[in-house]
Amino acid sequence: QDYVVSYIRRQLLSSGIHPTESGPYPAYAGALSHLKTSFRFTLKDNNRLGSLLELLHPTPAVCGLPKEEAYRFILDNEGYDRRYYSGFIGWLDPDGKTDLYVNLRCMHIENGQLSFYAGGRTAGFFGTE
């Protein structure tokens, strides 16, 4: 979790954005929980949202670090197209308020076939970072 938070913080600061952070704190989905950190900030130019998302995606939770090297390794070695494995989901308010989340677990339906994309790890094995 700390890798992702540090990465997002660095990317935002490199873009001149100084966010307010809260977390980490537990977020629950049924019986499952994970650590979550929220970033709040204002974009002076809403037209920058697309380029900001491009800068942030994929996060280390999806791709690894260093980003370019890890991304190239995945493309060269994974053996399938991730397509909708991850991305951003959320609300784009016409009045300017936006809530976006990194989405890691997705489903894709094509030609009567369902593909589920999921990732995870055991925190006890890898540690809590």
Where are these regions (language model features)?
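Glycine-rich, small/acidic residue-mixed loop/short-helix segments
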Residues: 63-69, 73-129
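Contiguous alpha-helical scaffold segments within structured protein domains
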Residues: 1-75
